[in-house]
Amino acid sequence: MITWEPWRAPPGEPRIAEQPDVALARIADGAFDDLVERWARDVAAYRGPVLIRLMHEMNGFWYPWGDAANGNSPEDFVRAWRRVHRIFARAGADNVSWVW
């Protein structure tokens, strides 16, 4: 299972929730599509079963994708999740099961 956590944490630095460069609206608007598309193609090429847990615990304040960080809203979460899911579907990554 892959736990996909959209944040930036340089080695040796603490992980903090306030990271506006990875706000959900940016994901939903396509700022990271190149990265997501690359992952989707690689997962589709793998062909074995893959479980992806995308942006878990979204209702907490402790993650950059949480609804209390970076100006995120529940609507932003839904838009970002759907965008990532659509990209995987377009890539033919039908070997993915999405974990809630």
Regions found by a protein language model. Give the residues of each.
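Substrate-binding cleft of extracellular glycoside hydrolase catalytic domains
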Residues: 1-100
